[in-house]
């Protein structure tokens, strides 16, 4: 970590683009910063800020290990990473939901009961094994988690799994694959996170940025200030 720079890790993609809009609204420099460019670092010496453009799944790692002081990441990614960081502010954008989904016909045959649905095969396909395992363990439902890297909706059709755990925004993809939501897990939005050591050592400087982002995001209440 470069000591004279405050380093902020940003995710590539739509979430990163929304994050840049928030940073600009908070009065932070973003001129020329692009989350889809080949350039992966952007430095502004005058205010002493550097941005790292990362894969969304890597943002918690950069923050946890001190390569970045702060980071913006989806709660879904943060929960799956299990990173030891401070979760400071719910930024409110990038909304999606974690859900358990099943084939419509099987759900009806099971009397719309998750326990009945799991009476036979207990395979669950997901890109988020940590989140999925936690959900079923908390309910005392033994399952076999199968990790996939994409197109989770294919798993029930191919006979690989009976249930899936995935994130949805509109639910359109589930409907197109004749899947229905059978249980909510939690809602996800973008979060501002901080390296635990950096937040304590550079508390005053980081707090000024945190408060500016809170105001820009319309967060008038207290910071979340939890760890994962």
Swiss-Prot record:
Under Gene3D superfamilies, the record lists: Periplasmic binding protein-like II
Keyword Transferase among UniProt keywords: yes
EC numbers, comma separated: 2.4.2.17
The UniProt entry lists the main location of this chain as cytoplasm
Sorted alphabetically, which keywords does the UniProt record give? Amino-acid biosynthesis, ATP-binding, Cytoplasm, Glycosyltransferase, Histidine biosynthesis, Nucleotide-binding, Transferase
Task: State a GO cellular component annotated for this protein.
Answer: cytoplasm
Subcellular location(s) of the protein: Cytoplasm
Q: Which reaction does it catalyse?
A: 1-(5-phospho-beta-D-ribosyl)-ATP + diphosphate = 5-phospho-alpha-D-ribose 1-diphosphate + ATP
- Is NADP there in the keyword field? no
Q: Name one GO molecular function term.
A: ATP binding
Set out the biological process GO terms recorded for this chain's protein: L-histidine biosynthetic process
Annotated pathway: Amino-acid biosynthesis; L-histidine biosynthesis; L-histidine from 5-phospho-alpha-D-ribose 1-diphosphate: step 1/9
HAMAP family (UniProt xref)? HisG_Short
The record describes its quaternary structure and partners as: Heteromultimer composed of HisG and HisZ subunits.
Q: What is known of its domains?
A: Lacks the C-terminal regulatory region which is replaced by HisZ.
**Similarity comment:** Belongs to the ATP phosphoribosyltransferase family. Short subfamily.
Function comment: Catalyzes the condensation of ATP and 5-phosphoribose 1-diphosphate to form N'-(5'-phosphoribosyl)-ATP (PR-ATP). Has a crucial role in the pathway because the rate of histidine biosynthesis seems to be controlled primarily by regulation of HisG enzymatic activity.
UniProt name for this protein: ATP phosphoribosyltransferase
* Annotated source species: Moorella thermoacetica (strain ATCC 39073 / JCM 9320)
């Amino acid at each position: 970590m470069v000591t004279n720079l405050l380093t902020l890790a940003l995710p590539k993609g739509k979430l990163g683009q929304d994050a840049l809009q928030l940073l600009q609204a908070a009065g932070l420099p973003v001129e020329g910063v692009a989350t889809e460019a080949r350039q992966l670092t952007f430095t502004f010496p005058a205010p002493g800020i550097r941005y790292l453009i990362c894969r969304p799944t890597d943002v918690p790692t950069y923050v946890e290990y001190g390569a970045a002081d702060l980071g913006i990441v989806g709660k879904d990614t943060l929960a799956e990473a299990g990173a030891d960081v401070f979760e400071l502010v719910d930024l409110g954008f990038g909304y999606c939901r974690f859900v358990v989904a099943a084939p419509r016909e099987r759900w009806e045959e099971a009397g719309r009961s998750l326990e009945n649905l799991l009476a036979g095969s207990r395979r669950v396909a997901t890109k988020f094994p940590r989140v999925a395992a936690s959900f079923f363990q908390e309910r005392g439902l033994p399952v076999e988690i199968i990790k996939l890297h994409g197109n989770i909706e294919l798993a029930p059709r191919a006979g690989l799994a009976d249930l899936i755990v995935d994130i949805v925004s509109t639910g359109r993809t589930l409907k197109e694959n004749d899947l229905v939501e059978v249980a909510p897990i939690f809602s996800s939005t973008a979060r501002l996170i901080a390296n635990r050591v950096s937040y304590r050592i550079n508390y005053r400087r980081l707090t000024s940025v945190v408060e500016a982002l809170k105001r820009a995001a319309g967060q008038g209440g207290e910071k979340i200030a939890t760890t994962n």
